[in-house]
Amino acid sequence: MIEGFCTNTGKDVFIHALCNSVGGYVHQNDIQNIGQFEQGNWPHLDWNKWTDKPCVVVGTLRGTERIIWECQKRNHPFYYMDHAYFGATRYYKSKGPNGVLYRLIRSQMQLNYIVELEKEDYQRIKKFGKQEWKPFHKNGEHILLCPPTKAICRLYNLGDEQLWIDTQLTELQKYTDRNIIVRKKDTKVSLQKHLENCHAVVTHQSTAAIEAILAGVPSFCDNVSAANEVSESLYENIETPYYPDDDLIKQWVDSLLSVQFTGDEFKDGTAYHTATRLQT
């Protein structure tokens, strides 16, 4: 039914859980201790013959990006897993109130559209609690630019991080003279601190855009972003950002909640069947 691809990291627990839940096949990797930007190897995968089953990967490192690219080239379905949008648990073992949480996205890396939830979906996401967001403040001063990581630059063929930064700065400065703060992932300043007195956040597909919207800061992003439905994309509008209303934000938040699942939901088939139903 599906074929999962392991990378010999803690992430593999999600590959096994999802595949086992529907009788899928797990491709073991015959290379140990694969570096983040090195290639693993799945000896039972024939890259030429490929497969007629949807593929399953976690993240974009250790060769999983090759699976994603091949699926995209062939217009072949795949399932992508990564950190949850809300209440994310890190390092695959840490547990929050609902245990380990991960998201499951079909044939892309982010959920960039609003899905139509059914009664059972609203019931399931209640356990994540009510998500709060602040009203948009419209008197911010600086612009916060959040560049993609090296892995994301590679995945989307964006060049390197500095090239992306330079390109966005050049474009933004055509339309604004505001101070632009570049926030790299390794910064010691918290995102919430950077969002204080912020006019707008600019990202490619970083989940920082989600936190920005919830903090009352408008977002500019690429259409592959999970914040796509509540954001602007044209820099010419940087001085007049888009402010989505509460009804749209609620639909958007519920959509993101609907694609994240607990460890048990990955094991019992809920994750696979729900993601397939909502995202097909």
Model-identified regions with their sequence ranges:
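Short, solvent-exposed loop/turn segments at secondary-structure junctions
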Residues: 9-11, 60-63, 84-87, 148-152, ...
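Donor nucleotide-activated moiety binding/catalytic core segment of transferases
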Residues: 40-49, 170-173, 178-227
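Structural motif
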Residues: 53-54, 142, 199-200
